[in-house]
Every structure is written in C-alpha cells, then in structure tokens.
C-alpha cells in the first residue's frame, strides 16, 4: 500500500494493532485489535468512540464574494445559515448526478471551508477553481487540517474535559483553542449519536488524539475504524458517496432533496434536477430490513415477490444494534413501503421488507 496516503495518526493506528486498508486513496484503519467492528459500534452507541477521519478532503474558498460564489455552485442554500454554522451540501454535474457530498463551514462572506470526501477532493477543488471569478481563490487544504470525530452519549463530557466548547447547536461550529493550538469544533457527525468533529492543524492531530484517550479512560472511550463507521451510518440510512450517491445517482433519487436550495436561481445541475423532480424519479432509495438471515450487500439484485427485477442494493451490512441484515437500495418507482422483496444472495432469495430509514432512533441534536 505504498502508493496510499497516510493520516497524521498512522503510527497511532499501527501501535493499536489496527487492520489497515485503502479507502479513497488513503491507508486507514478498518478495525482495531482486541475490539473489532461489533465492539467499536457498540462503544459509539453506548459510550463514546473516537474516529480518525483526517483523510476527508478540505478546501478553502476565500475572497470578496466567496460565499456567494459557493452558493452559485453547490446545491444547498448558504443563505439559510449564518456565519458559525455548517451545512450539508452537494456538488452536482449538469445531469444532476452527485459528484460529491460535502460539508460547508461558513466563516463569513469572504471565507468558506469545504470538507469533501477523500477521493473527490481534487475534483471538487478543480471544478470550483475553474469556475471561480476574479478575486475568489480556491485552495486545496487536504493536509492543512486533521479531523477527529468524537461520537456517542459521552461525547460532550469527553470534549468538555479538554476545555473545548460543547454547548453549540447542531451543525454550529466555533474556532476554539486547545493548549494554545487552534481547533475548529463542530457539533456534527455521521453516526446518529450526539457528537463533535474536531479540526486541528494537521501536525497537532496526534497530540489531540492522545489527549482525548487520556481523558476518556473512565468514559469507555474506544478508537473506532471505518468498518464501524459504515455500520453506524447504515443504521441511520445516511448515504455514502460512491454507493448511495454518485455521478449517476441524483439527490432526487437518493431522497437528498432537502439538501437542495430549490428556490435558488443558480447551482450546478439545477435544470436537470428541477425537471426530474417535476416528472418524478424513475427510482428511489429505500431501506431494506431482512426478515431472515440474509445480509444485503452492494450490487446484489433486488426482485419483487413475482421475480421481476426492481433494483439493486447500494449499501448493506449486519446491524449490530438490531442483530439483522439491513441495507439501502435503489428501487423502481412502483415499489412501496412495506412491500416484500428478495435480494439475490449467491443465487438464493433473501426476503426483505421495504422500509424508510433510519433503522434505529437517531439522537444527533
């Protein structure tokens, strides 16, 4: 994996016996020795988990009119939020497909920090840079910041133990300091639990990681890899780009229309998305809950009770909370909530009930 990039915490992961694998061009921990996906998942649901997600992209858009420019490109409406708030948004292509889903941190009208997915950072930066007007700069800051996600019921206690603010509203952020070092603290996450995402400077990330674990000894704090991150987000029905969202899957199909500023005059993909919304999508993202032992996996075909093909699984896993197989699938427009469908599991039908996620209660706010 010599061609893969590494986070500033690579050495910490190796010391913890992490199983490392490539993800989005980065060598990242999937699970940790002596723990595993199940225990790490349960730590987040019951106590607190600490994730290294420093592989996530970062890009800064600065200059006079920076926020206005971002708003004319990305799907959501920055006019809905004030400085000090973050917003989930989409970078779409002309056909309405999703090039990436990302978080926009609005500092001011002259500064927006974007956090794309790792594999798509360069493309998002290139698209924005090519469209930027005079006076607006788009700077790749992929290795300018680390990202630590602290998630779970005990997350506020742990973050507060470091002297960092914890009382902000959901999706709000502050520029704080820890031991004189700058760190952005945002009330957000990808797990459905109360949580925070901390963005220290890249080189400060190991020290902050160590401090979190030192303070978390009595709280049941656990390192959490990308394996449990996937089971946690799937239980919430949160989409993953490259599976549930992609350049050929639109926000209308993926039920992400809430992240589109439909009243805006300009954003990439606007005409195609307005047309699709008016006509109705040919397929929609649904949840699948196994009624037997089958576990849905990406790309498995889905058929109706009569055997007719109706779609394909986009995400699937075993739910540690529910102890059953769950998944997300793009299904034909005629499929409805409560329908029984079958997933082709190595040539055998796996019965599933069509449901609306989340699969378990969410408490992020």
Curated annotation (Swiss-Prot):
It holds the Pfam family GCV_T. Keywords: Aminotransferase, Transferase. One of its GO terms (cellular component) is cytosol. GO terms for biological process: glycine decarboxylation via glycine cleavage system. It is an enzyme of class 2 (transferase). Gene3D superfamilies: Probable tRNA modification gtpase trme, domain 1. InterPro entries: GCS_T, GCS_T_bac, GCST_C, GCV_T_N, GcvT/YgfZ/DmdA, GcvT/YgfZ_C, TrmE/GcvT_dom1. Its EC number is 2.1.2.10. One of its GO terms (molecular function) is transaminase activity. The glycine cleavage system is composed of four proteins: P, T, L and H. The glycine cleavage system catalyzes the degradation of glycine. Belongs to the GcvT family. This is Aminomethyltransferase.
């Amino acid at each position: 994996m010599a061609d893969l990039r590494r986070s500033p915490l690579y050495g910490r992961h190796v010391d913890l016996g992490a199983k490392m694998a490539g993800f989005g061009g980065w060598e990242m921990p999937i699970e940790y020795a002596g723990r595993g996906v199940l225990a790490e998942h349960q730590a987040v649901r019951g106590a607190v988990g600490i994730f290294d997600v420093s592989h996530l992209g970062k890009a800064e858009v600065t200059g006079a009119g920076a926020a206005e420019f971002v708003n004319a490109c990305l799907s959501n409406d920055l006019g809905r939020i004030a400085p000090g708030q973050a917003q989930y948004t989409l970078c779409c292509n002309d056909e309405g497909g999703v090039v990436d889903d990302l978080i926009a941190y609005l500092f001011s009208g002259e500064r927006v920090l974007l956090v794309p997915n790792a594999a798509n950072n360069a493309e998002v930066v290139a698209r924005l840079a090519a469209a930027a007007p005079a006076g607006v700069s788009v700077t790749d800051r992929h290795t300018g910041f680390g990202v630590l996600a602290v998630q779970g019921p005990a997350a506020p206690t742990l973050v507060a133990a470091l002297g960092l603010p914890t009382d902000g509203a959901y999706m709000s952020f502050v520029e704080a300091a820890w031991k004189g070092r700058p760190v952005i603290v945002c009330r957000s996450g990808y797990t459905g639990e109360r949580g925070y995402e901390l963005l220290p400077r890249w080189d400060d990330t190991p020290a902050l990681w160590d401090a979190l674990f030192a303070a978390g000894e009595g709280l049941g704090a656990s390192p959490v890899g990308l394996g449990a991150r996937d089971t946690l987000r799937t239980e919430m029905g949160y989409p993953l780009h490259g599976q549930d969202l992609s350049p050929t899957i639109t926000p209308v199909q993926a039920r992400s229309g809430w992240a589109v500023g439909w009243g805006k005059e300009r954003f990439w993909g606007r005409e195609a998305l307005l047309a699709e919304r008016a006509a109705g999508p040919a397929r929609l993202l649904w949840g699948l809950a196994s009624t037997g032992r089958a576990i849905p996996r990406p790309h498995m075909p889905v058929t109706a009770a009569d055997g007719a093909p109706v779609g394909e699984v986009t995400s699937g896993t075993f739910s540690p909370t529910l102890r059953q197989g769950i998944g997300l699938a793009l299904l034909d427009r005629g499929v409805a909530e409560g329908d029984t469908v079958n997933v082709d599991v190595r040539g055998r039908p796996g019965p599933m009930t069509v449901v609306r996620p989340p699969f378990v209660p969410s408490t992020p706010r």
